[in-house]
A protein has these predicted regions:
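Sec-dependent bacterial lipoprotein signal peptides
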Residues: 1-21
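Subset-of-secretome marker
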Residues: 2-6, 23-279
């Protein structure tokens, strides 16, 4: 299964890394941030509270990795009771044609594990299986995965918004139109030393998929466009050599996301770890 590392990472990158800044950011910086830019932080605080309270959203997403074509995804995100998602992504862009003949591949995140709706394979751990499973530890390493999955909602859009409260160099870039909606554009930089437990993920070495693909990151640059009703219209994160952009189509009232039946699932976590270690 030499294809597994590159194929799975392309899909994971779009969502596994989005929002790492939001997990456990150190709250001791809140007072400093408000003192520096009270009006901006108040606006972001309102947007955070609104996003957090709604608990889910329908989204469209694009991930760009250096030297690769953008990967488009769309579906539902949920963060009301832990972080989960159910999305469809372009099979060809994600380089997963060897795993499914479908032009799009359904991808789930449930309880810190990623599931891909693949075609049953003739041999190996996916023989006769409908789903491929990859644990977050294969992406971020064991410590990084614990940091990201140990907090309710870690990695979700609401967590991203919370991280903005503790950023340095927060700027109001004015009113713009994005995705056909009028919104105020804010930009912030969060240093990894102010990410709390999430810095374990950013500290991942080259022996993890995160480190080998993004080159690691000392900070995250985040842009958010806040529109009507104090809700985000778009979020954008730059993490190392990766850029993730998320557009919100509708908030609230999405279906629960559940893991596939264990009998239909093949776990390739250890294969992914070994492949990353060989890079």
């Amino acid at each position: 299964m030499r294809y597994t590392r590159g194929a799975v990472w392309a899909g994971l990158a779009a969502v596994a890394l989005a929002g790492t800044a939001g997990c456990g950011a150190q709250t001791t910086r809140a007072g400093e941030a408000v003192g520096r830019a009270g009006a901006i932080m108040a606006a972001l605080g309102r947007a955070t509270d609104r996003t957090d309270s709604l608990g889910s959203a329908e989204v469209r997403m694009s991930t760009e990795l250096k030297g690769a074509a953008p990967i488009a995804m769309e579906g539902t995100y949920s963060w009301g009771d832990g972080y989960a998602y159910d999305v469809e992504m372009d099979t060809k862009a994600a380089k997963m044609e060897t795993l499914t003949r479908s032009p799009s591949i359904r991808t789930l995140l449930v309880d810190g594990a990623y599931y891909y709706d693949t075609d049953p394979q003739p041999s190996g751990p996916l023989k006769g299986k409908e789903w491929m499973k990859v644990d977050a530890s294969a992406v971020f390493g064991d410590k990084g995965a614990q940091a990201l999955t140990g907090t309710s909602g870690a990695g979700s859009p609401a967590a991203i918004m919370r991280g903005l409260r503790y950023a340095s160099d927060v700027r109001d870039l004015g009113r713009q139109t994005v995705d056909g909606k009028r919104a105020t554009h804010y930009r912030a930089v969060i240093d990894k030393n102010h990410l709390g437990r999430a810095k374990e993920a950013l500290a991942s070495g080259d022996d993890t998929l995160f480190g080998s693909v993004t080159g690691g990151a000392d900070s995250i640059t985040m842009d958010v466009w806040v529109g009507a009703g104090d809700l985000p219209v778009r979020l954008k994160e730059v993490i190392g050599t990766m850029t993730v952009t998320m557009d919100f189509e509708k908030f609230g009232a999405t279906a629960d996301v559940k893991a596939p039946p264990a009998a239909q699932t093949g776990d390739v976590t250890e294969l992914m770890k070994k492949a990353a270690a060989r890079q």
